[in-house]
Amino acid sequence: MFSKFALTGSLLAGAVNAQGVGTQQTETHPQMTWQSCTSPSSCTTNQGEVVIDSNWRWVHDKDGYVNCYTGNTWNTTLCPDDKTCAANCVLDGADYSSTYGITTSGNALSLQFVTQSSGKNIGSRTYLMESSTKYHLFDLIGNEFAFDVDLSKLPCGLNGALYFVTMDADGGMAKYSTNTAGAEYGTGYCDSQCPRDLKFINGQGNVEGWTPSTNDANAGVGGLGSCCSEMDVWEANSMDMAYTPHPCETAAQHSCNADECGGTYSSSRYAGDCDPDGCDWNPFRMGNKDFYGSGDTVDTSQKFTVVTQFHGSGSSLTEISQYYIQGGTKIQQPNSTWPTLTGYNSITDDFCKAQKVEFNDTDVFSEKGGLAQMGAGMADGMVLVMSLWDDHYANMLWLDSTYPVDADASSPGKQRGTCATTSGVPADVESSDASATVIYSNIKFGPIGATY
């Protein structure tokens, strides 16, 4: 994605990430089943569960109820610096349905955009668990990942994102001794934007250098970022979609400092060791303007299946392809219609290089190692993220409109969808589309050809 940020959104007062655990709210993970397959007729059901990211949770002093963070400002008494903040603050359990609009039923996970309880929650980010204390790690190379999605209620400006990142399975507990909450409480997030809006990173606060956001009442940017490789299997609303690999020179989770992080949060986008843009496949951007949308070939007014295949073996990733199933019909990805890209309908290193030239984009993907480096990250196992968010940085225009907004829409690659360049303003969508919901279901995983 072009301008991804960590999904803090407009959170409940005091919601923040911390590394110790409080006792005010019991933590009970919603249960969710998924399947491992050896062939389309031979799948085993796994009993899984999901956890919400710690950045959404209520964080308070370890001995009481005093918020460590309110609105987009730290409590300077409890959090005068990074280390003291981690020592003083704990995060608490989550009421998934009432507070965050997160529910499960069998193999389905439903995420509601705006949930009103004692406070107002916007969006969510969840992880699939292997156990109550460990994230499940997926070995993607040589395998395929399939899921059903209903995003008929997601308009311009929203993003139902399902993706993988190279987080630590334990949420960073083994690496960082001050992190005693771990995966059970959703700690350890990282991605290719090296997000700096995380309140705690590597077991310490992100207090020092914190600047409150000017357009998000509950977010800000700190002096630390958390980086790792990212594979966006699915970023979409009912108007447009994209899938995008983002390699990092160091694939595993690691921290960075201030503007050296690069990405969305920094003054120099390409200053870090990760590729914030990635190599994206968006059918509309590739010239197929009637392929995806309400009433189109892939009809987003109805549920459909997404199957993503990761070609290669070991740590060698050679190609990423994607097809769809709807109404019992298999729908192949169409080839691009741009003159220099007509031979492509999947992501390869050759495609990525040609696309960057055709679209006049900076080729950071190749600079950071391309599919070879993406494969290096995948080989260590990746955590599944399922989320719903809006974009306080670019209004999601990089996904569903003309971007940059002052670009000639007829120029190759600049028009990514039909949404207006004035659409996607968070204050607008949080009001007009509060009831928006995305449902992910029927996850299947196995060797290429094994799920369908």
Curated annotation (Swiss-Prot):
Family in the record: Belongs to the glycosyl hydrolase 7 (cellulase C) family.
Range of residues in the leader sequence: 1-18
Native organism: Cryphonectria parasitica
Catalytic residue positions: 230, 235
Record keywords, A-Z: Carbohydrate metabolism, Cellulose degradation, Glycoprotein, Glycosidase, Hydrolase, Polysaccharide degradation, Signal
Protein name from the UniProt record: Exoglucanase 1
Domain of life: Eukaryota
Annotated GO MF terms: cellulose 1,4-beta-cellobiosidase activity
Gene giving rise to this polypeptide: CBH-1
Reaction equation(s) it catalyzes: Hydrolysis of (1->4)-beta-D-glucosidic linkages in cellulose and cellotetraose, releasing cellobiose from the non-reducing ends of the chains
Catalytic activity, EC: 3.2.1.91
Main function: The biological conversion of cellulose to glucose generally requires three types of hydrolytic enzymes: (1) Endoglucanases which cut internal beta-1,4-glucosidic bonds; (2) Exocellobiohydrolases that cut the disaccharide cellobiose from the non-reducing end of the cellulose polymer chain; (3) Beta-1,4-glucosidases which hydrolyze the cellobiose and other short cello-oligosaccharides to glucose.
GO biological process: cellulose catabolic process
Glycosylation sites: 75, 335, 360
Pfam families xrefs: Glyco_hydro_7
Record InterPro entries: ConA-like_dom_sf, Glyco_hydro_7, Glyco_hydro_7_sf
Keyword Cell wall biogenesis/degradation: no
